[in-house]
């Protein structure tokens, strides 16, 4: 019977991995290495899973940095709060906060990821073998579970430079917790020898995420309609190897069209560009994180001290990593072909990640706002949580 040490030393790479990549169990102590270490592979061997994880959990949605209170001069020349609602939560409206006005906010979100491309993260079958080697010695069939949770606290500040231009900063603080378990069976390709194993690894990391700087300017300001443009710049301030950040700078120009009133519809469209990141690395080095086209369409309904908000949020990712549903994969065991159930890499393509956001903003006193929101997934693209709760406090000066 072959030894466990020999098995680990000769563990096979995935069907889609490049030839010549050798498996190792010593990847490192960062969360980026947790999954490949549990599976006894290198991070480059298993980067299809880390790519998918990194694309999503390093670019978590943030609440809007726009103030719930909008100030402007009324017809009599008095500078006063002019909005009939407190605005959206996860999207923008065209109005700016007002000249020399200041806004602070803090939000908390919890992400409990449950699926990846429609696959339950509690049950991920993966087959490891050497399809390109002339004499592979080991085939390993595994059933895997990946538990990932992120607690995110974000501090926001917005300042009105002029009556038409706002500058904002968002500083996220995150705690990422991961647990990876793998149950597997190892088979000799030339004999009846076999062995079973179980691995469990857990880890966590805390720290500052990627800081986001943004500017928004109102282009058109009519009595009821407004048009604004803006740009977000995401800094690579978070530790990408611990999934606290994306590992690269990102730029997102966007356009906002909205209507003012008790019922205030709004439309946001934007394009997120990302640079090269370790989270998308392959045998040729760091590669770009997938870009995406994002949109938000919805409305907020303002009452005297309460605003109800609903948005359809969508992101269309380009050239993004995905994994398949489990399919039959054949490998040689005891010199005979045997079929195993396994997910495999889907060649980089496009997919959509759509969510429904429903929330409320309440004004208990003064210029204080209390917010609550639920982000509900509508489809299966990417690494997803079924529901993401949000609570927040904000104050305008």
Please provide the spans of the model-predicted regions.
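Residues on the lipid-exposed face of transmembrane beta-strands in outer-membrane beta-barrel proteins
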Residues: 90-93, 104-108, 155-161, 169, ...
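Outer-membrane beta-barrel translocator domains and adjoining extracellular loop/strand segments
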Residues: 116-121, 180-186, 229-230, 239-247, ...
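Hydrophobic alpha-helical segments and helix pairs
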Residues: 197-249
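Repeated loop/turn-to-beta-strand initiation elements of outer-membrane beta-barrel proteins
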Residues: 113, 164-169, 222-227, 261-267, ...
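Outer membrane beta-barrel transmembrane domains
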Residues: 124-128, 191-197, 286-397
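Transmembrane beta-strands of outer-membrane beta-barrel pores
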Residues: 108-114, 171-177, 210, 219, ...
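A subset of solvent-exposed loop/turn segments in beta-rich extracellular surface proteins, enriched
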Residues: 25-168, 172-209, 281, 322-341
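Residues that define the transmembrane beta-barrel architecture of outer-membrane proteins
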Residues: 86, 98-100, 149-155, 202, ...
């Amino acid at each position: 019977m072959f030894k466990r040490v020999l098995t680990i030393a000769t563990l096979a790479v995935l069907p889609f991995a490049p030839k010549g990549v050798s498996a190792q169990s010593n990847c490192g102590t960062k969360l980026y290495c947790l999954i490949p270490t549990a599976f006894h592979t290198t991070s480059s061997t298993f980067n299809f899973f880390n790519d998918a994880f990194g694309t999503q959990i390093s670019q978590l949605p943030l609440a809007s940095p726009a103030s719930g209170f909008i100030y402007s001069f009324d017809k009599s020349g008095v500078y006063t709060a002019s909005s009939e609602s407190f605005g959206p939560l996860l999207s923008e409206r065209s109005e700016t906060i007002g000249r020399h006005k200041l806004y602070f906010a803090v939000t908390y979100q919890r992400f409990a990821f449950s699926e990846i491309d429609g696959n339950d993260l509690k049950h991920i079958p993966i087959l490891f073998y050497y399809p390109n080697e002339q004499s592979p010695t080991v085939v390993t069939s595994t059933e895997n579970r990946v538990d990932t949770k992120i607690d995110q606290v974000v501090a926001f500040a917005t300042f009105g430079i002029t009556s038409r231009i706002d500058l904002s900063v968002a500083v996220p603080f995150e705690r990422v917790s991961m647990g990876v378990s793998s149950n597997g069976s190892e088979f000799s390709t030339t004999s009846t020898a076999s062995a079973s194993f179980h691995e469990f690894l857990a880890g966590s990391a805390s720290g500052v995420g990627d800081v986001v700087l943004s500017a928004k300017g109102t282009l058109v300001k009519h009595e009821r309609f407004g048009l604004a443009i803006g740009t977000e710049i995401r800094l690579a301030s978070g530790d990408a190897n611990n999934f606290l950040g994306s590992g690269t700078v990102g730029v997102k120009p966007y356009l906002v069209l909205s209507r003012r009133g008790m019922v205030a519809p709004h439309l946001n469209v934007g394009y997120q560009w990302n640079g090269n990141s370790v989270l998308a690395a392959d045998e040729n080095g760091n590669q770009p994180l997938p870009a995406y086209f994002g949109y938000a369409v919805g409305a907020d309904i303002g009452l005297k001290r309460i605003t109800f908000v609903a948005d359809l949020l969508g992101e269309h990712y380009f050239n993004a990593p995905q994994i398949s549903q489990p399919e039959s994969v054949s490998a040689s065991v005891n010199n005979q072909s045997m079929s195993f159930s396994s997910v495999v890499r889907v060649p980089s393509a496009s997919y959509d990640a759509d969510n429904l956001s429903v929330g409320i903003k309440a004004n208990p006193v003064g210029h204080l706002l209390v917010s609550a929101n639920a982000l509900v997934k509508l489809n299966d693209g990417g690494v997803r949580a079924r529901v993401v709760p949000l609570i927040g406090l904000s104050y305008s000066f």
